[in-house]
């Protein structure tokens, strides 16, 4: 027993940050059962397969709970599960905007089924996704998708708060966002890439209302200049107290509104 206890202690120490944020437990002890007919779901007609990533507000840091009412699925490391909160993939242990969005897309009749591929990580900068630790997670996930011959139909990027605090310049952000888009294009994933307009963070910066215009202009300009990139919702506009707890992450009401703003952007783009 002493030996077993020592081994557990070593593992826990080496993975203490992983354990704290709940990611380790969900990776190894989530106890969820993968669906048996994975290929049948993937090959369904009228299905959206969306890749969703960024920092905490894309990564299960929302308040409250949510239960999907439609055929909304969660792809994770080669398996597909019925979507449950917290989604498998992101590092947060709360609730996501993406499950709500999946239901809205199906309720609207735009799609009959939705598969979510979520990999968001709290507090990450855009540089982390193109050159540092988060890039490894992105690459690993794309490798899993490649093995399963799955290509996302849509890509949703929601990030910018950390770059607001870090003081990332407009030109730096633009260049890194283009690099991030090219990660998908180099793998022949030509799905539309939606970038939210996101920078709002009320602490640790001197920007008016906590909004960094350099970051938001970079996101808007990439959407205008780069083929296949679409401007997503302006999350900075959802900064009222009843939309955010601790002034940063989304409440249940905030998640409902955020999902609706994503839905409107997708519906408008697909009507063209």
Features from the language model and the residues they span:
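Cell-envelope and extracellular/periplasmic
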Residues: 5-272
């Amino acid at each position: 027993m002493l030996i077993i206890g020592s081994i557990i202690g070593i593992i826990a120490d080496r993975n203490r940050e992983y354990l704290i944020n709940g990611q380790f437990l969900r990776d190894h002890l989530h106890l969820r059962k993968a669906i048996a007919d994975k290929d049948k779901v993937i090959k369904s007609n009228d299905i959206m397969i969306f890749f969703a990533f960024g920092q905490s507000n894309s990564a299960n840091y929302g308040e409250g709970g949510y239960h999907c009412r439609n055929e909304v699925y969660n792809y994770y490391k080669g398996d597909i599960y019925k979507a449950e909160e917290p989604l498998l993939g992101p590092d947060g242990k709360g609730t996501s905007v993406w499950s709500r969005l999946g239901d809205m897309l199906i309720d609207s009749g735009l799609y009959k089924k939705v598969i979510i591929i979520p990999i968001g990580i709290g507090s990450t900068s855009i540089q982390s996704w193109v050159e540092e630790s988060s890039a490894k997670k992105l690459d690993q996930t794309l490798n899993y998708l490649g093995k399963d011959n799955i290509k996302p139909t849509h890509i949703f990027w929601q990030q910018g708060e950390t770059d607001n605090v870090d003081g990332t310049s407009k030109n730096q952000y633009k260049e890194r966002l283009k690099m991030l888009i090219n990660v998908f294009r180099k793998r022949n994933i030509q799905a539309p890439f939606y970038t939210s307009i996101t920078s709002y963070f009320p602490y640790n910066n001197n920007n008016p209302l906590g909004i960094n215009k350099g970051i938001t202009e970079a996101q808007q300009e990439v959407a205008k200049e780069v083929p296949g990139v679409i401007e997503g919702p302006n999350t900075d506009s959802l900064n009222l107290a009843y939309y955010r707890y601790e002034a940063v992450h989304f409440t249940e009401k905030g998640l409902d509104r955020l999902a609706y703003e994503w839905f409107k952007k997708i519906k408008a783009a697909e009507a063209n």
